[in-house]
Amino acid sequence: MSSGRIVQIIGAVIDVEFPREAVPKVYDALSVDGTETTLEVQQQLGDGVVRTIAMGSTEGLKRGLGVTDNGEPIQVPVGTKTLGRIMDVLGRPIDEAGPIGEEERMPIHRAAPTYADQAATNELLETGIKVIDLVCPFAKGGKVGLFGGAGVGKTVNMMELIRNIAIEHSGFSVFAGVGERTREGNDFYHEMKDSNVLDKVSLVYGQMNEPPGNRLRVALTGLTMAEKFRDEGRDVLFFVDNIYRYTLAGTEVSALLGRMPSAVGYQPTLAEEMGVLQERITSTKTGSITSVQAVYVPADDLTDPSPATTFAHLDSTVSLSRDIASKGIYPAIDPLDSTSRQLDPLVIGQEHYDIARGVQTVLQRFKELKDIIAILGMDELSEDDKLIVSRARKIERYLSQPFFVAEVFTGSPGKYVSLKDTLAGFKGILGGDYDHIPEQDFYMKGSIDEVIEAYNKRSK
């Protein structure tokens, strides 16, 4: 273990001078003497100087302070001892519940599984959310992205998915909070505690107020914990909220390291950094990682380089729409914009495929008719088109659903709808079985039985 000293501090970037024969390797962890600050080597500048990123605040550091090379990358605790605990980017507990007591630590930088080790599956993962199970079903061991602008419900959807899948699915989950609000992290912890699933979830937080080094590496910390569970032969759920903040932290670090920015000011290594993370989130022959990632879309522009780069790595994309949210339909998922590789008759079966495509066809036709309705009014439509509009409005409302995690805000109990009930409901609407029921009875209901019950109660 060699020793050096700090020669320059610029925000979160610190230059450290070492003897020329003992320069640390890139990604080695360094400890600043007399503090709890850890640095990670990013560049070797020559003459024994390395440029590092601080994993934590640089307040109180000054030139001349001694630094020790740990000789290895950042190591974090892994295994079952991490379950039920909240940790920071270095794997230190931040929940005031004593030491982790881990039996093993692993480096956060690892190679992705080789092509020969990877394994794909077509097994579906039921979420209990109608619109997702219908038009963009999730695969076990697949990658899912929740795309949406500010305030359309990414985190609420993520929390509902965690609640539904973590409770129905008996395996372990890892949640990485990357650059999100501390309040949301706190809410999430208590939500897990109240649902009695905290002992199956490892939580890793690097929140908005943390330096860019923490936000850049916290996703890798969470992923390392998930990889350990997978390599033990388990099926793991890995949740990331928010992958955009990971990119943003990379942009901040890149600028501080003096790299020339590329399109829209992002780092020139955007695709590579995203690939390094995403290629490790994969299923092997020993176990699977099913990942759900929230992706913030800046200014609702899906062509922005950050969400556009993320798209390439996903199996299912769930797109949240501000227009749907403005109608008061939650979850505000756009069934015409959301896609899944699983939406294939060979995977989900012909009946499910036909119902999903039927729903999308009716909604697409309704979208085309909106301009005519706005100019000429409903009366000018043919009888067939009037029927399509009527069914489309019912489908739109029936795609809404009360969430368990939103009970405290809405006052209405959450609903978990099985795939069988979801398909039966939409098949009935498309077949005209419920043409006599007014559209308001379809709003915020679970299964179709609740719609019929509400109609019968009102018509008495």
Swiss-Prot record:
ATP binds at residues 148-155. It is an enzyme of class 7 (translocase). It is a peripheral membrane protein. InterPro entries: AAA+_ATPase, ATP-synt_VA_C, ATP_synth_F1_bsu, ATPase_a/bsu_AS, ATPase_alpha/beta_chains, ATPase_F1/V1/A1_a/bsu_N, ATPase_F1/V1/A1_a/bsu_N_sf, ATPase_F1/V1/A1_a/bsu_nucl-bd. It catalyses: ATP + H2O + 4 H(+)(in) = ADP + phosphate + 5 H(+)(out). CDD domains: ATP-synt_F1_beta_C, ATP-synt_F1_beta_N, F1-ATPase_beta_CD. It is found in: Cell inner membrane. Keywords: ATP synthesis, ATP-binding, Cell inner membrane, Cell membrane, CF(1), Hydrogen ion transport, Ion transport, Membrane, Nucleotide-binding, Translocase, Transport. Pfam families: ATP-synt_ab, ATP-synt_ab_N, ATP-synt_VA_C. GO terms for molecular function: ATP binding; ATP hydrolysis activity; proton-transporting ATP synthase activity, rotational mechanism. Its EC number is 7.1.2.2. GO terms for cellular component: plasma membrane; proton-transporting ATP synthase complex. It comes from the Bacteria. Belongs to the ATPase alpha/beta chains family. Produces ATP from ADP in the presence of a proton gradient across the membrane. The catalytic sites are hosted primarily by the beta subunits. PANTHER family: ATP SYNTHASE (PTHR15184), ATP SYNTHASE SUBUNIT BETA, MITOCHONDRIAL (PTHR15184:SF71). F-type ATPases have 2 components, CF(1) - the catalytic core - and CF(0) - the membrane proton channel. CF(1) has five subunits: alpha(3), beta(3), gamma(1), delta(1), epsilon(1). CF(0) has three main subunits: a(1), b(2) and c(9-12). The alpha and beta chains form an alternating ring which encloses part of the gamma chain. CF(1) is attached to CF(0) by a central stalk formed by the gamma and epsilon chains, while a peripheral stalk is formed by the delta and b chains. HAMAP family: ATP_synth_beta_bact. NCBIfam families: atpD. This is ATP synthase subunit beta. The lineage of its organism: Bacteria, Pseudomonadati, Pseudomonadota, Gammaproteobacteria, Oceanospirillales.
